[in-house]
Amino acid sequence: MARAVGIDLGTTNSCIATLEGGEPTVIVNAEGARTTPSVVAFSKSGEILVGEVAKRQAVTNVDRTISSVKRHMGSDWTVDIDGKKWTPQEISAQILMKLKRDAEAYLGEPVTDAVITCPAYFNDAQRQATKDAGKIAGLNVLRIINEPTAAALAYGLEKGKEDERILVFDLGGGTFDVSLLEIGKDDDGFSTIQVQATNGDNHLGGDDWDQKIIDWLVSEVKNKYGVDLSKDKIALQRLKEAAEQAKKELSSSTSTSISMQYLAMTPDGTPVHLDETLTRAHFEEMTSDLLGRCRTPFNNVLHDAGISVSDIDHVVLVGGSTRMPAVKELVKELTGGKEANQSVNPDEVVAVGAAVQSGVIKGDRKDVLLIDVTPLSLGIETKGGIMTKLIDRNTAIPTKRSEVFSTAEDNQPSVLIQVYQGEREFARDNKPLGTFELTGIAPAPRGVPQIEVTFDIDANGIVHVSAKDKGTGKEQSMTITGGSGLPKDEIDRMVKEAEAHEAEDKKRKEDAETRNQAEAFAYSTEKLVNDNKDKLSDDIVKEVTDKVNALKEALKGDDTEKVKTAQTELMTAAQKIGQVLYAQQGAEGAAAGADGAGASAGSASGSDDDTVEAEVVDDDDDKDNK
């Protein structure tokens, strides 16, 4: 049976885990690391690179390297590579395919089922895009679950039997969430994890802290050299890598040096060098506004849950950005001096929780119940542009809610159902999720027809909406996919393309291996001929040398089949060398044996006159004779 996995599809890094004997295990990737950079690159030859190898070549291939694509999920953003427009779903699918391949190599069996995490504050379009990315990657997405919920799931399983409230503070590379959860265990060890409230900011994360350093460095260079690096893509990529490294170093040191040579050239040809020292105090000062943006979601969660800071039992930090000392201090301040729990790895805990949830869904774990919530209110636009909410935020999911509406005009033949997600009073200020029309309403004065609108949110947090005219029984429904949603045929096309790319990559790898083997064989055969020229006939030397040259010529081209043919012909010719060398070796051995046998026979059959009589003398006799 195929294995199920849990995947944390992150902005900066991604992680994959599975259950081994009922316990979660993080899967090491092909490079030997426990997390994989969420970076995808397209080489000039058309090869798709993912992870560390893509990240390493970013400076020399800026326009064809994509990072932090998670920030574009649920939008209509695309990137043009060689005339093909790639969507965020397709780029994310490449990351998922890499994780899937590495997991299959690690486990030695197929991986088809996955629970994929997303930020708790992702809206419907972003969740649908995440699910689509999984489909394109060839995964059966069992569930989309919220990252803080997954983290609490991993953390909560280690706790005792007492009921506890856990606050999860999740600051990743590109998104920020705060969730409050209640965890309880009964006497049989059955855990119930219920989300009480969640809030966040989908455009706040470690990337923004990096950008502050980049902006500062650009400003320093401009002041010193008069050169604006903000238009230089290669210089910016180098600054980005330096900024990320500086941020990490300032988590453990009070200052760091940023030194970069030959970043650019001034108009008069002077090279631009960078040598700056950034202190932690200066870094915290320049990023104080970002830190301030973390306060509102925290306060909103406490307000929505109706609790005070003193009701929080534990604080769990998730996401690499929570390693920054200023973030830890902020959490401590907000929670009234509570020290955050250090028992979980902030980079891995989300994937671990997702793996546990995959086990729950597949029936491998029967000791956990997870109850999540919808992060944003859902409603429709009614007369006057009002946002009429049918499902309030922080409602436990799955859930279903219906409400009856009517027409605004006499004899109105149809109604346009416009679905929105958000907390603002007017529909236009919220996120539009989709629109559909219910037609065929029987003529009647306004206010008479009864139109029942039903919202159904599944366990993935994805919305299904239907509208029914109670008078005629006519019904219209849709699954919300948002403005960026992909129709099924488009997803199917992308799945086929992704499979084709995977097949292409596999063939490219096989071709490279074939060429390497052929090159090595040509070299070793040529050496064998040169080392044994004196033992080989001119005909064999010429035949093999010609075949070696033919193989070398084939290797200069791109036709792998031609290389294979040339290698096969060389192997056939090279066999003659072996036959000659072994034959000569056998002949020499036979000759040596014949010489030895002749000597023995001569001694035995000679005449008596030729026989030498001898006696053995001891040492004393020998001495006397001397």
UniProtKB/Swiss-Prot annotation:
PROSITE patterns: HSP70_1 (PS00297), HSP70_2 (PS00329), HSP70_3 (PS01036). Residues 607-626 have a biased composition (Acidic residues). Keywords: ATP-binding, Chaperone, Nucleotide-binding, Phosphoprotein, Stress response. Residues 586-626 are annotated as: Disordered. CDD domains: ASKHA_NBD_HSP70_DnaK-like (cd10234). One of its GO terms (molecular function) is ATP binding. Acts as a chaperone. Belongs to the heat shock protein 70 family. This is Chaperone protein DnaK. It comes from Bifidobacterium longum (strain NCC 2705). The gene is dnaK.
